[in-house]
Design a protein with these regions (language model features):
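Active-/binding-site microenvironments in catalytic and ligand-binding cores
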Residues: 1-239
Length: 239
């Protein structure tokens, strides 16, 4: 009997859509999206029947689902152009479920007995359900200092969360950002759909544009789940 392995890939989109006028974080301006060259205006540059649109966007780096590099926190840290692809693409990933409605703090106990080394650690709080509402900006879940230190000591590759901020915004020292980015561990914030992922056994990608001199930029974050099926090949047995 021969076995034929068939690989099927399933992709889970983990990013919010960036739209004109949306607010990601109170106090930061919304993106402005418009035509730089409209289809109508482009017609004079091309043959009859040929037209294009060239878009223009004005936005702050912290828009939508975005990734922080060490440069976001530290002047001498790696910026977007220096970040190795090995730290943001094709990462073995693990999801920790922290969607407790009455508990904001996510401490190190959630990671106990887990091997986070070389993995993308994704923290599923369910807070993305409030995206686009006023509630999203108030009382969000966050990672405590000891939890961030556990991930840094454990050698995690990247940390992501589906919340407003990985830190408690009332703590102006931003301990989670400080610890993780000092350890050269990228952070992805404002994620979504983490509930659609398995706890482990998938790859994670969050790749921003390669920009020099910037520490943050939106990403198209996604998980890739591979299913391997074994099917029997017909084979005649002679008696």
């Amino acid at each position: 009997m021969n076995l034929n392995k068939q690989e099927n890939k399933h992709f889970v989109d983990l990013s919010h859509t960036v739209e004109h006028g949306m607010i990601t974080y109170k106090g930061l301006p919304a993106p402005l999206i418009c035509d730089y060259l409209s289809r109508e205006e482009s017609r004079k540059h091309y043959s009859e029947g040929t037209q294009f649109q060239i878009g223009k966007i004005e936005m702050v780096a912290n828009t939508g689902t975005y990734l922080d590099t060490p440069f976001h926190r530290y002047a001498g840290g790696l910026d977007l152009s220096q970040l190795p692809l090995s730290s943001i693409a094709n990462l073995e990933a693990i999801v920790f479920r922290a969607n407790h409605p009455l508990r904001r703090e996510i401490d190190a106990s959630i990671f106990v007995d887990s091997d986070v080394s070389e993995k993308a650690v994704l923290i599923h709080t369910g807070w993305d359900a409030h995206w686009g509402s006023e509630q999203y900006f108030e009382g969000h879940p966050f990672l405590t200092k000891d939890a961030a230190q556990f991930l840094a000591d454990g050698g995690a590759k990247l940390v992501g969360i589906d919340s407003l901020n990985i830190d408690d915004t009332a703590d102006l020292s931003r301990p989670a950002h400080s610890i993780l980015l000092q350890a050269e561990m990228p952070i992805v914030e404002h994620m979504c759909n983490l509930g659609a992922l398995p706890d482990a056994g998938f790859k994670f990608f969050a790749v921003p544009v390669k920009v020099k001199g910037m520490g943050t930029f939106p990403v198209r974050a996604f998980g890739m789940i591979e299913y391997v099926e074994e099917t029997k090949r017909g084979q005649t047995e002679q008696g």
